[in-house]
Amino acid sequence: MELMVKGADALTVSETTFGREFNEALVHQVVVAFAAGARQGTRAQKTRSEVSGGGAKPWRQKGTGRARAGTIRSPIWRTGGVTFAAKSQDHSQKVNKKMYRGAMKSILSELVRQERLIVVDNFSVEAPKTKELVAKLKELELTDALIVTSEVDENLFLAARNLYKVDARDVAGIDPVSLIAFDKVVMTAEAVKQVEEMLA
């Protein structure tokens, strides 16, 4: 199949990468796993065995008229431990390479179908100026876009950093979440070739 390239000849690409059927279940599973892997999972509360104090019995067992108590660390007490204390845990989920590649191909194919993937011959800015990038995006009639280049372009990265709905990445930096997070995805022809090789 062929992809239209702005300002250049059409680019021949693989049908399996850019023309496959959308697998919603697979994409959902991979995106959820990706989001789960981004969780820190560092929360920690103290159980009754971890709270400080509570060595001595607060008052004697009988004769005070108060309810019996053996420790000030009891979860019933204001300064006691937490009954079912939340502990740090690993939320990451396993995603096989085949599944990951399948989800990426599915997303790219859907972007092509919905005409949300824009392929350009070249995309760069002369200086790390946001104004320059805004002008370039205006030419393409874009306000919400992910820009993917074949290699890290520092000027482009710095220019995009201050824009709310614009991000610039190289091919190695894209993932399922970033591809679906933006309204449009702008890729250079060289980046398209690299993506195809990466997912082959």
UniProtKB/Swiss-Prot annotation:
Transmembrane segments: none
Record's keyword annotation contains Lipid biosynthesis: no
One CC-aspect GO term: ribonucleoprotein complex
Keywords for this protein: Ribonucleoprotein, Ribosomal protein, RNA-binding, rRNA-binding
Region (Disordered): 42-65
Listed InterPro entries: Ribosomal_uL4, Ribosomal_uL4-like, Ribosomal_uL4_dom_sf
Pfam families per record: Ribosomal_L4
Keyword rRNA-binding: yes
Top-rank lineage group of the source organism: Bacteria
Signal sequence extent: none
Coiled coil (residue ranges): none
GO molecular function, one term: structural constituent of ribosome
Gene Ontology terms: biological process: translation
Family under the similarity heading: Belongs to the universal ribosomal protein uL4 family.
PANTHER family according to UniProt: 50S RIBOSOMAL PROTEIN L4, LARGE RIBOSOMAL SUBUNIT PROTEIN UL4M
Quaternary state and interactors: Part of the 50S ribosomal subunit.
Function: One of the primary rRNA binding proteins, this protein initially binds near the 5'-end of the 23S rRNA. It is important during the early stages of 50S assembly. It makes multiple contacts with different domains of the 23S rRNA in the assembled 50S subunit and ribosome.
Protein name in the entry: Large ribosomal subunit protein uL4
Organism of derivation: Vibrio campbellii (strain ATCC BAA-1116)
Lineage, uppermost ranks: Bacteria, Pseudomonadati, Pseudomonadota, Gammaproteobacteria, Vibrionales
